[in-house]
UniProtKB/Swiss-Prot annotation:
Sequence similarity: Belongs to the eIF-2B alpha/beta/delta subunits family. MtnA subfamily.
Metabolic or biological pathway, per its Swiss-Prot or TrEMBL entry: Amino-acid biosynthesis; L-methionine biosynthesis via salvage pathway; L-methionine from S-methyl-5-thio-alpha-D-ribose 1-phosphate: step 1/6
GO function terms (MF aspect): S-methyl-5-thioribose-1-phosphate isomerase activity
Enzyme category, top tier: isomerase
Native organism: Chaetomium globosum (strain ATCC 6205 / CBS 148.51 / DSM 1962 / NBRC 6347 / NRRL 1970) (Soil fungus)
Subcellular location: Cytoplasm; Nucleus
Organismal lineage: Eukaryota, Fungi, Dikarya, Ascomycota, Pezizomycotina
Annotated keywords: Amino-acid biosynthesis, Cytoplasm, Isomerase, Methionine biosynthesis, Nucleus
Protein name as catalogued: Methylthioribose-1-phosphate isomerase
InterPro entries: IF-2B-related, IF-M1Pi, IF_2B-like_C, Initiation_fac_2B_a/b/d, M1Pi_N, NagB/RpiA_transferase-like
GO biological process, alphabetically ordered: L-methionine salvage from methylthioadenosine
Catalytic residues identified in the record: 258 (proton donor)
Main location group: cytoplasm
Length: 389
């Protein structure tokens, strides 16, 4: 079955699906400069930690391929690349995939510097190395997501002895599918894998206020792929667990991550922490799905994570397609409406931090990580190349 694509890329051209227009309109923006990528990311036309990193990396690759770098020496070429990447790094501060990708891309450009080459050849080698590294980030993300889905489905199957005759139901939050990645998704990828193996009874997705990524995007993906699913508001999760956990065999809350730090504390879309508390109270497993690029071993705990705050209007206003008097949706017309007194004070953090003690497993492309006897997550098995005491 065809899946949605948030990112379409060929060398020299990048198209990014404008997710603010979903689910009623499919429109791709051409992104050919760092400035356009910054605006695309900042305005949340593209979102999801992996997708943000991919768009930033590829937008600069398009710039370089199309000749925007006028530097003549290797040193100036690298300085130009690094300045553009530093600019893109500020587009959204909480997701660690972006900063990890930028570090990798800088390293690739520096490593391409070859002694003895004339300046034009040296510059070309640096540009080619950057473009190849950016394209590798795109290709690896899809492979990683498929592996996350496989490992996550296997872990849940083992926990609950799920079978096609006794499948699991799960709840997910925000959007972590093809629209947040290069394809398949992280947490939603686990749901896809369960569904493909006939181990999924039902998926529940939260509305995910205030930006409604669950109702606008995840619900759209689930319907698009024919996965049995129900949309609930964020505040219905407790009632869902209390009233339907046993009948629907609700076994897990599966979420993505914008940043997982060394002790396992996880920054994710606002509302994730509340779901973790509810899951623990009701005996439901709480699972984080994230590629190893989302793991930040330099930050010891969630206290060190910078939490982005968004503008008040995202909480007090909504935009959507116009509903006609007969109940039909006119996708050609949109309207922005106020849903609160515009004079009210607003606190609008984009993310919260779920403490590691509320998390049962962190599923990566290299396997599921669970806490040891000391109650701590140990990422040394999935990140031996980056782990150090």
């Amino acid at each position: 079955m065809a899946t949605l694509q948030a990112i379409k890329y060929s060398r020299g051209k990048l198209l990014v699906l404008d997710q603010l227009r979903l689910p009623h309109e499919h429109h791709y923006d051409e992104v050919s400069t760092a400035e356009q990528a910054f605006d695309c990311i900042r305005s949340m036309r593209v979102r999801g930690a992996p997708a943000i990193a991919i768009v930033a990396a590829l937008a600069h690759a398009v710039e370089l391929h199309n000749g925007d770098c006028t530097a003549t020496t290797p040193e100036d070429t690298i300085a130009y690349i690094e300045s553009r990447l530093d600019y893109l790094k500020d587009s959204r501060p909480t997701a660690v995939d972006l900063s990890n990708a930028i570090a990798l891309l800088k390293q690739a450009a520096r490593a391409a510097t070859v002694e003895g080459l004339a300046h034009p050849e040296a510059k070309e080698a640096i540009l080619n190395a950057y473009i190849a590294a950016a394209e590798t980030i795109l290709a690896k993300d899809l492979d990683n997501n498929t592996s996350i889905g496989t490992h996550g489905a296997a872990w849940l199957q083992q926990q609950y002895h799920a079978t096609p005759s006794r499948p699991l139901s799960v709840l997910t939050h925000c959007n972590t599918g093809s629209l947040a990645t290069s394809g398949h998704g992280t947490a939603l990828g686990i749901i896809r894998s369960l569904h493909q193996q006939q181990l999924l009874k039902h998926a529940y997705c939260t509305e995910t206020r205030p930006y409604n990524q669950g109702s606008r995007l995840t619900a759209f993906e689930l319907v698009f792929e024919g996965i049995p699913a129900t949309l609930v508001t964020d505040s219905m999760a407790a009632a869902l667990f209390a009233l339907h956990r046993e009948r629907m065999n609700i076994g897990a809350v599966v979420v993505g991550a914008d940043r997982v730090v060394r002790n396992g504390d996880t920054a994710n879309k606002i509302g994730t922490y509340a779901l973790a508390v509810l899951a623990r109270h009701h005996g439901v497993k709480f699972v984080v799905a994230a590629p190893t690029t989302s793991i930040d071993l330099e930050t010891e705990s969630g206290a060190g994570i910078e939490i982005e705050e968004r503008k008040p209007e995202e909480l007090t206003q909504v935009t959507g397609a116009v509903v006609n008097a007969d109940g039909s949706v006119d996708a050609s017309r949109t309207a922005r409406v106020a849903i609160a007194d515009q004079r009210i004070g607003v606190w609008n953090p984009a993310f919260d931090v779920t403490p590691h003690d509320l998390i049962d497993a962190i599923v990566t492309e290299r396997g599921a990580v669970v806490k040891g006897a000391d109650g701590r997550f140990d990422f040394s098995q999935v990140l031996p190349e980056r782990w150090r005491w």
